[in-house]
Regions:
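A structural signal for short, hydrophobic/glycine-enriched beta-strand patches
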Residues: 2-177
């Protein structure tokens, strides 16, 4: 028989973020973490190539439009050591431009190679004030780690989780009669 252990573990991580936290009426900044694109395919075919975390980009669009005065940072460099020219920011810039978002309103941080660097480099760019409301858009399974890194670096971010991999009422064994 097949027991979906991986799904169960992801569910345990994601469940904390199933309900979107109420977004404040005023949002001063939006931080979108990279990892939703395939820079190699983008470079090869000159087409936007999104991966299984595409919601990071797609779901950011209505948020960017709603809070059009907010500072927006897309953070994603290259995770490929010998190819620093292949970053997520390049693909994201093309994506936003293609769907009609003014790319001048987005700051593309393209040096980070991992979540830690996403937070560190983006915080330097954001220079957040203590009373500012900053949203963090990333995958639900990635949110806790990103928030822990931000907290350790004195940056209070409001989670806006996307890219869920499991339904809200996931059960490891849905029906014992099936066993």
């Amino acid at each position: 028989s097949f027991i979906p252990i991986g799904s169960f573990l992801i569910y345990k991580i994601e469940k904390e973020y199933h309900s979107h936290i109420k977004i404040p009426e005023i949002v001063d900044g939006i931080l979108i973490l990279g990892g939703a694109t395939d820079p190699l395919l983008f470079k090869e075919y000159d087409q936007i190539s999104l991966n299984g975390s595409a919601e990071r980009l797609v779901e950011s669009v209505p948020i960017i439009k709603k809070f059009d005065k907010a500072k927006v940072i897309f953070s994603g460099g290259s995770g490929i050591i010998n190819r620093p020219d292949l970053g997520h920011s390049q693909v994201a810039k093309s994506f936003y431009k293609k769907i009609g978002i003014e790319i001048d309103q987005i700051i593309f941080e393209d040096q980070s190679r991992n979540t830690y660097e996403n937070i560190i480099y983006s915080k330097k760019i954001a220079n957040p004030k203590i009373n500012e409301n900053w949203l963090l858009i990333t995958s639900a399974s990635h949110m806790k780690r990103a928030l822990l890194i931000a907290d350790k670096n004195n940056w209070k971010l409001i989670p806006y989780a996307v890219d869920f991999k499991n339904i809200k009422n996931f059960k490891l064994i849905p029906n014992f009669r099936l066993l």
